[in-house]
Amino acid sequence: MEAKAVIYAILDFDGEKTARLVRAHLDQGADAREILDQILIAAMDEVGRQFSSDIFFVPEMLMAAEAMQAGLEVLMPYLARSEIRAKGTVVIGTVRGDIHDIGKNLAAMMLECAGYNVIDLGVDVSKGKFLAAAKKHQAHIVALSALLTTTLTEMEAAVSDVRARAGGTLKTLVGGAPVTASFAAEIGADGYSPDAAGAVAIARNLTEAVSK
Protein backbone atom coordinates (compact mmCIF):
# COMPACT_ATOMS: atom_id res chain seq x y z
CA MET A 1 0.00 0.00 0.00
CA GLU A 2 1.46 3.34 -1.03
CA ALA A 3 1.91 6.26 1.32
CA LYS A 4 0.52 8.53 -1.37
CA ALA A 5 -2.94 7.03 -0.88
CA VAL A 6 -3.04 8.36 2.69
CA ILE A 7 -1.72 11.75 1.61
CA TYR A 8 -4.36 11.99 -1.12
CA ALA A 9 -7.08 11.07 1.39
CA ILE A 10 -5.98 13.96 3.61
CA LEU A 11 -5.85 16.34 0.65
CA ASP A 12 -9.38 15.17 -0.20
CA PHE A 13 -10.45 15.96 3.40
CA ASP A 14 -11.57 12.35 3.91
CA GLY A 15 -10.95 11.53 7.56
CA GLU A 16 -12.70 8.16 7.43
CA LYS A 17 -10.54 6.99 4.53
CA THR A 18 -7.41 8.38 6.17
CA ALA A 19 -8.08 6.42 9.35
CA ARG A 20 -8.83 3.25 7.40
CA LEU A 21 -5.62 3.50 5.36
CA VAL A 22 -3.48 4.23 8.40
CA ARG A 23 -4.95 1.19 10.13
CA ALA A 24 -4.18 -0.91 7.04
CA HIS A 25 -0.55 0.28 7.07
CA LEU A 26 -0.26 -0.75 10.71
CA ASP A 27 -1.82 -4.15 10.01
CA GLN A 28 0.81 -4.69 7.32
CA GLY A 29 3.59 -4.07 9.83
CA ALA A 30 4.44 -0.45 9.09
CA ASP A 31 6.17 1.45 11.88
CA ALA A 32 3.87 3.95 13.59
CA ARG A 33 6.58 6.60 13.93
CA GLU A 34 7.36 6.35 10.21
CA ILE A 35 3.67 6.71 9.35
CA LEU A 36 3.56 9.87 11.44
CA ASP A 37 6.72 11.46 10.05
CA GLN A 38 6.72 10.25 6.46
CA ILE A 39 2.99 10.26 5.71
CA LEU A 40 0.84 12.37 8.04
CA ILE A 41 3.29 15.21 8.61
CA ALA A 42 4.33 15.06 4.95
CA ALA A 43 0.67 15.50 4.03
CA MET A 44 0.37 18.61 6.19
CA ASP A 45 3.54 19.98 4.62
CA GLU A 46 1.80 19.64 1.27
CA VAL A 47 -1.28 21.37 2.68
CA GLY A 48 0.97 24.23 3.72
CA ARG A 49 2.46 24.47 0.24
CA GLN A 50 -0.97 24.55 -1.35
CA PHE A 51 -2.07 27.25 1.07
CA SER A 52 1.01 29.33 0.25
CA SER A 53 0.23 28.90 -3.46
CA ASP A 54 -3.38 30.07 -2.97
CA ILE A 55 -4.73 26.65 -3.97
CA PHE A 56 -6.03 25.98 -0.46
CA PHE A 57 -7.57 28.60 1.79
CA VAL A 58 -8.48 28.57 5.49
CA PRO A 59 -11.52 26.23 5.17
CA GLU A 60 -9.49 23.68 3.20
CA MET A 61 -6.65 23.82 5.71
CA LEU A 62 -9.04 23.15 8.56
CA MET A 63 -10.67 20.20 6.78
CA ALA A 64 -7.30 18.70 5.88
CA ALA A 65 -6.12 19.07 9.48
CA GLU A 66 -9.25 17.29 10.70
CA ALA A 67 -8.63 14.42 8.27
CA MET A 68 -5.03 14.19 9.45
CA GLN A 69 -6.24 14.14 13.05
CA ALA A 70 -8.41 11.11 12.25
CA GLY A 71 -5.30 9.26 11.14
CA LEU A 72 -3.35 10.41 14.17
CA GLU A 73 -6.01 9.03 16.50
CA VAL A 74 -5.46 5.58 14.99
CA LEU A 75 -1.72 5.90 15.65
CA MET A 76 -2.04 7.06 19.26
CA PRO A 77 -2.14 3.58 20.87
CA TYR A 78 1.02 2.63 18.98
CA LEU A 79 3.04 5.66 20.00
CA ALA A 80 4.12 6.88 23.40
CA ARG A 81 2.81 10.40 23.88
CA SER A 82 6.36 11.66 24.33
CA GLU A 83 7.25 10.27 20.91
CA ILE A 84 4.41 12.11 19.21
CA ARG A 85 5.42 15.37 20.85
CA ALA A 86 9.15 14.95 20.35
CA LYS A 87 9.48 17.98 18.10
CA GLY A 88 9.07 20.49 20.93
CA THR A 89 6.57 22.52 22.90
CA VAL A 90 5.00 25.75 21.68
CA VAL A 91 3.06 28.17 23.87
CA ILE A 92 0.70 30.18 21.67
CA GLY A 93 -1.77 32.99 22.22
CA THR A 94 -3.21 36.27 20.98
CA VAL A 95 -1.66 39.25 22.76
CA ARG A 96 -3.37 41.36 25.41
CA GLY A 97 -6.11 43.65 24.13
CA ASP A 98 -6.87 41.46 21.10
CA ILE A 99 -9.66 38.87 21.12
CA HIS A 100 -9.29 37.59 17.55
CA ASP A 101 -8.40 33.92 17.37
CA ILE A 102 -8.97 32.48 13.88
CA GLY A 103 -5.36 32.86 12.75
CA LYS A 104 -4.04 31.76 16.11
CA ASN A 105 -6.29 28.68 16.15
CA LEU A 106 -5.22 27.72 12.65
CA ALA A 107 -1.53 28.08 13.51
CA ALA A 108 -2.04 26.00 16.66
CA MET A 109 -3.74 23.25 14.68
CA MET A 110 -1.01 23.22 12.03
CA LEU A 111 1.73 23.06 14.66
CA GLU A 112 -0.02 20.25 16.51
CA CYS A 113 -0.46 18.28 13.30
CA ALA A 114 3.25 18.76 12.62
CA GLY A 115 4.09 17.02 15.88
CA TYR A 116 4.42 19.85 18.38
CA ASN A 117 2.95 19.93 21.86
CA VAL A 118 0.85 23.09 21.69
CA ILE A 119 -0.20 24.99 24.81
CA ASP A 120 -2.96 27.36 23.67
CA LEU A 121 -3.45 30.28 26.06
CA GLY A 122 -6.35 31.72 24.09
CA VAL A 123 -6.83 35.45 23.52
CA ASP A 124 -6.07 38.65 25.42
CA VAL A 125 -2.91 37.11 26.90
CA SER A 126 -0.59 39.29 28.98
CA LYS A 127 3.18 39.14 28.60
CA GLY A 128 3.45 37.61 32.06
CA LYS A 129 1.14 34.74 31.17
CA PHE A 130 3.18 33.90 28.08
CA LEU A 131 6.39 33.63 30.07
CA ALA A 132 4.80 31.81 33.02
CA ALA A 133 3.27 29.18 30.71
CA ALA A 134 6.54 28.77 28.83
CA LYS A 135 8.41 28.09 32.06
CA LYS A 136 5.71 25.78 33.42
CA HIS A 137 5.64 23.63 30.28
CA GLN A 138 9.35 23.95 29.47
CA ALA A 139 8.47 25.37 26.07
CA HIS A 140 10.89 25.88 23.21
CA ILE A 141 8.86 28.59 21.47
CA VAL A 142 6.41 31.33 22.42
CA ALA A 143 4.16 32.13 19.44
CA LEU A 144 2.33 35.46 19.57
CA SER A 145 -0.52 36.54 17.31
CA ALA A 146 -2.16 39.94 16.78
CA LEU A 147 -4.83 41.19 14.40
CA LEU A 148 -5.19 44.74 15.65
CA THR A 149 -2.53 47.33 14.88
CA THR A 150 -3.22 48.88 18.28
CA THR A 151 -1.98 45.72 20.03
CA LEU A 152 1.42 45.60 18.34
CA THR A 153 2.89 47.39 21.34
CA GLU A 154 1.70 44.46 23.49
CA MET A 155 3.44 42.05 21.14
CA GLU A 156 6.64 44.07 21.40
CA ALA A 157 6.41 44.12 25.19
CA ALA A 158 5.87 40.35 25.36
CA VAL A 159 8.79 39.62 23.04
CA SER A 160 11.03 41.96 25.05
CA ASP A 161 9.95 40.23 28.27
CA VAL A 162 10.85 36.80 26.92
CA ARG A 163 14.22 38.03 25.66
CA ALA A 164 15.05 39.73 28.95
CA ARG A 165 13.94 36.97 31.29
CA ALA A 166 14.53 33.76 29.32
CA GLY A 167 17.65 34.60 27.33
CA GLY A 168 18.33 32.61 24.19
CA THR A 169 16.82 29.37 25.45
CA LEU A 170 13.26 30.39 24.55
CA LYS A 171 12.47 31.53 21.02
CA THR A 172 9.69 33.87 19.91
CA LEU A 173 7.57 33.52 16.78
CA VAL A 174 5.19 36.30 15.72
CA GLY A 175 2.46 36.68 13.13
CA GLY A 176 -0.88 38.26 12.31
CA ALA A 177 -2.37 40.63 9.75
CA PRO A 178 -0.59 43.84 10.86
CA VAL A 179 2.73 42.10 11.57
CA THR A 180 5.51 42.39 8.98
CA ALA A 181 8.97 40.91 8.69
CA SER A 182 10.51 44.31 9.35
CA PHE A 183 8.40 44.82 12.48
CA ALA A 184 9.34 41.35 13.73
CA ALA A 185 13.02 42.15 13.25
CA GLU A 186 12.59 45.55 14.89
CA ILE A 187 11.14 44.10 18.10
CA GLY A 188 13.70 41.30 18.23
CA ALA A 189 11.45 38.33 17.47
CA ASP A 190 13.33 35.18 16.52
CA GLY A 191 10.86 34.19 13.82
CA TYR A 192 8.06 35.62 11.70
CA SER A 193 5.47 33.95 9.52
CA PRO A 194 2.88 35.72 7.36
CA ASP A 195 0.50 32.77 7.63
CA ALA A 196 -0.31 29.67 9.68
CA ALA A 197 1.20 27.27 7.17
CA GLY A 198 4.54 29.02 7.25
CA ALA A 199 4.61 28.91 11.05
CA VAL A 200 5.44 25.20 10.97
CA ALA A 201 8.60 25.66 8.90
CA ILE A 202 9.75 28.57 11.07
CA ALA A 203 9.07 26.58 14.23
CA ARG A 204 11.22 23.74 12.92
CA ASN A 205 14.10 26.12 12.29
CA LEU A 206 13.76 27.63 15.75
CA THR A 207 13.61 24.30 17.59
CA GLU A 208 16.65 23.09 15.68
CA ALA A 209 18.50 26.25 16.74
CA VAL A 210 17.58 25.66 20.39
CA SER A 211 18.74 22.03 20.31
CA LYS A 212 22.18 22.88 18.91
Identify the meaning behind each predicted range.
Residues F57, I99-H100, T151:
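Alpha-helix N-cap/loop-to-helix initiation residues
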Residues R85-A86, T207-K212:
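Non-catalytic signal-transmission and effector/linker regions of two-component phosphorelay proteins
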Residues I41, R96-D98, P178:
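Short glycine-enriched loops at secondary-structure junctions
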Residues M1-E83:
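Long amphipathic alpha-helical segments
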Residues A107-A114, I119-A189, D195-R204, E208:
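Cofactor-cradling patches in redox/metallo enzymes
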Residues R85-L121:
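Glycine-rich active-site/cofactor-binding loop and its immediate structural neighborhood
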Residues T18, T94, T149-T151:
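Ser/Thr-centric signal marking residues that sit
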